[in-house]
Amino acid sequence: MGVKQTPPVQVKVSDADSTNRRKSSSQEGNPQLVQLKAKSDKDKRKGSSDSTASIMGSSNALPTKNLTTPPALNPLTTSISRGNTAYERSVNGSRITMHSNLAPTETQDVSWSEIDTLDDVKKMAKEPIVNDGFPRDFESNLTQMRKSHAQLLRLMRERNQRLKYAKLRSPPHKDQHNSATNKDQEPDEVLHDPEIALDGEKYVSQVVDTIKDVHRC
């Protein structure tokens, strides 16, 4: 048997491949072009890394707080400090005491007391007065009621004294203010003495009538 011979394979090179090969061969032959190309590639990589780092830094940056700036004051309240004791005056006028290791001075206490008293006086001046003064005959009725009450008390003391001596079988000592008789009286006679009973009813009725007059006023 005879061996079959294979025809040789022909490879066709395109014009673009030949052009690239010629460029690469020309660049390899020129070392200056190779250095310039490497430098440009390095600059491109560096620029891209710097831009990426700046973007990441700006996204991760936190707002800084100025620690040296004093805090803003509250416009609703004002604080006044004297010595080691501080007072705070709020908008509605009430006093808030900030406690400290020392007590406020006497002058400060007096000042706050005067302010509180002035506020109370202003508040009372705005309130309507329900009972402005007393009725016209109130004073005279009160005087009459006190007189009748005093007469009633005197009569009760006199009767108790006569009752005491009647129990002891001894007459009481007569003076200018004593209307007791010299004759001996029994305890029952003293309790039911018509003179004492009449005077007692008179003084009691005077007190009751005066109280009614006061209520009518």
UniProtKB/Swiss-Prot annotation:
Disulfide bonds: none annotated. Residues 60-78 have a biased composition (Low complexity). Pfam families: DUF5315. Residues 38-48, 172-189 have a biased composition (Basic and acidic residues). Residues 1-85, 167-189 are annotated as: Disordered. One of its GO terms (cellular component) is nucleus. Present with 1360 molecules/cell in log phase SD medium. This is Uncharacterized protein YBR197C.
